[in-house]
């Protein structure tokens, strides 16, 4: 293994974290719980480490104001695309200029093997697009690499290395000059991560990517402005689900099952339907998998009053897929085809959305 890209290297790290002689960083509770569960449910697939964590992303954020009201928000969440339509009304007699931001989550490259990035674009890694009254409204993107509170972006650029090494910009650490490698290690940008098959030292990136996207938006007086925003979500995935009866009844997984039931408001009726499909076999003979989406909703409370009309549509991608989440004040309005719809009037979000989808994919 003399030439290895970040993705291949990360795969090796993921495998090593489940081995007794692997690197020292502790695997997540999810992986540790599954390792324990192997002793009591030996049929859990060896591919358990194929799980990927979702990033929590929301819609657009605006500076808190009493001059602009959100007339309506129409949010549609699917596994391949999230889209939001906002209608804003300037309630004053003069133009109001607000800073519009799309907060992208931090990416800790030391944990990159566990994160689902929807795009290989190192800058716009969720392929977001924004329109105002039907016309493209680009946001200015600023991206920085940080080690603790230290900005190391200039050093990476000096060494002609990408801030976010994904897609065509992957880094082959073994191809770097020894002096460059040594400098990155000394400055805390590379961390030792075990040995390769031929005995060479392997490294993992040690910096965090912080990305912000902003623009200035003018809201004319006494009129409505339509803002549309869409992007590809970061979707968490697992090749099985611990909510299958043979696994959720394992004492070793009790804490994780309880977390699932709380975070996704999993009801007994949901589990009963899951049991019908999964059966009671130790093996995942029905080939059920999980998909998870997190959506930051609480930022919708930044307006002059509540959101007057709110609609949420969830599209799991198939009528045979089970969906569970905590609706809070949202009321189910209809189910059309594959989609579920929820609505609320005078809505003030007080919690974010965490959506669980179980089925075949």
Please place each PLM-identified region on the residue numbering.
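Intrinsically disordered, low-complexity regions enriched in Ser/Pro/Gly/Gln/His and often acidic
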Residues: 23, 37-38, 288, 296
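Proline-rich low-complexity regions
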Residues: 10, 29-31, 101-105
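N-terminal secretory signal peptides that target proteins for export/translocation
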Residues: 1-29
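Short non-domain terminal segments
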Residues: 27-29, 37, 60
């Amino acid at each position: 293994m003399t030439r290895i890209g970040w993705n291949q290297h990360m795969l090796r790290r993921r495998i090593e974290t489940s081995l007794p002689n692997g690197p020292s960083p502790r695997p997540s509770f999810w992986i540790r719980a599954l390792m324990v569960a192997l002793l009591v449910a030996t049929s859990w697939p060896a591919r358990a480490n194929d799980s990927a964590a979702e990033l929590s992303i929301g819609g657009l954020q605006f500076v808190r104001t009493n001059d602009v009201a959100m007339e309506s928000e129409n949010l549609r969440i699917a596994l391949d695309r999230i889209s939001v339509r906002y209608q804003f009304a300037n309630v004053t007699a003069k133009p109001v200029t607000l800073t519009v931001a799309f907060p992208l989550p931090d990416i800790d490259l030391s944990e990159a093997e566990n994160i689902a990035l929807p795009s290989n674009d190192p800058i716009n890694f969720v392929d977001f697009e924004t329109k105002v009254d039907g016309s493209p409204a680009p946001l200015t993107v600023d991206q920085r690499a940080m080690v603790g509170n230290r900005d190391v972006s200039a050093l990476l650029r000096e060494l002609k290395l990408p801030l976010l090494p994904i897609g065509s910009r992957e880094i082959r650490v073994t191809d770097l000059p020894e002096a460059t490698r040594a400098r990155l290690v000394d400055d805390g940008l590379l961390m030792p991560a075990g040995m390769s098959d031929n005995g060479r030292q392997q490294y993992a990136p040690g910096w965090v990517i912080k990305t912000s996207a902003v623009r200035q938006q003018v809201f004319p007086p006494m009129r409505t402005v339509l803002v549309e925003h869409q992007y590809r979500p970061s979707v968490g995935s697992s090749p099985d689900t611990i909510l299958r009866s043979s696994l959720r009844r394992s004492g070793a997984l009790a804490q994780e099952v309880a977390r699932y039931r709380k975070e996704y408001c999993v009801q007994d009726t949901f589990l009963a339907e899951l049991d019908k499909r999964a059966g009671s076999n130790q093996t995942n003979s029905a080939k059920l998998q999980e998909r998870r989406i997190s959506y930051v909703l609480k930022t919708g409370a930044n307006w002059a009053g509540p959101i007057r009309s709110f609609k949420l549509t969830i599209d799991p991608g198939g009528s045979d897929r089970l969906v569970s989440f905590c609706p809070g004040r949202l009321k189910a309005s209809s189910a059309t085809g594959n989609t579920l719809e929820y609505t609320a009037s005078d809505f003030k979000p007080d919690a974010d959305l965490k959506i669980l989808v179980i089925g075949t994919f």
